[in-house]
Regions:
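Immediate post-signal-peptide N-terminus of mature secreted/exported proteins
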Residues: 28-71
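Bacterial N-terminal signal peptides that target proteins for export
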Residues: 2-12
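Secreted/luminal cysteine- and crosslink-motif detector
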Residues: 26, 54-56, 104, 118
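Residue-level signal for mature regions of secreted extracellular proteins and peptides
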Residues: 18-19, 46-48, 96, 110
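Compact alpha-helical subdomains of small soluble proteins
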Residues: 78-145
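C-terminal motif of bacterial Sec signal peptides marking the signal peptidase cleavage site
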Residues: 21-24
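Residues embedded in well-ordered secondary-structure elements
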Residues: 13-14, 44, 92
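Short E/K-rich amphipathic alpha-helical oligomerization segments
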Residues: 67-82
Length: 145
């Protein structure tokens, strides 16, 4: 009786030892066929043609557009209840961070030097005003509203 039980266990283990190495072979072939080589697409830098003055002007325009949207609501809670407006602000925040990154990568410290067309005080004043309204564009598309 014990012999039959041991024989069944032995047969089961032998069966698993033979079958298990081949169990995963079919899945790998299917996965390899299904995978399409991914081509990394570099995002188009829409701000690449701007100079320092253009960067400042574009940043102020984005801040002004965002402020206009925010000011069309009495409270931040009212703004949050309108998904379309929230999406517009997130899109502007994303554009703002892309602009900052692009301009900083090209001009580095030059964007921090005030000039007639690079009015850093106005930019900071508008950014602070928007921040006081509850929107921090520097957070980009991760902006919490």
């Amino acid at each position: 009786m014990a012999f039959k039980k041991n024989l069944k266990i032995f047969n089961f283990i032998a069966f698993l030892a033979i079958i298990l190495p081949f169990a995963g072979c079919g899945d790998g072939a299917k996965k390899k066929q299904a995978e399409v080589p991914k081509i990394a697409n570099k995002p188009l830098d829409i701000y690449s043609k701007l100079d320092v003055c253009g960067c400042n002007k574009e940043a102020i325009e984005i801040i002004d557009l965002t402020t206009d949207i925010r000011n069309s609501f009495k409270t931040i809670k009212e703004l949050k209840s309108k998904p379309k407006s929230v999406e517009q602000i997130r899109s502007l925040a994303s554009s703002y961070t892309k602009l900052l990154e692009s301009c900083f990568n090209r001009y580095a410290s030059k964007i921090f030097i005030p000039s007639d067309c690079n009015n850093l005080n106005e930019l900071e004043r508008k950014r602070t005003e928007l921040s006081n309204l509850g929107i921090q564009l520097e957070q980009g598309e991760r902006l919490k509203l």
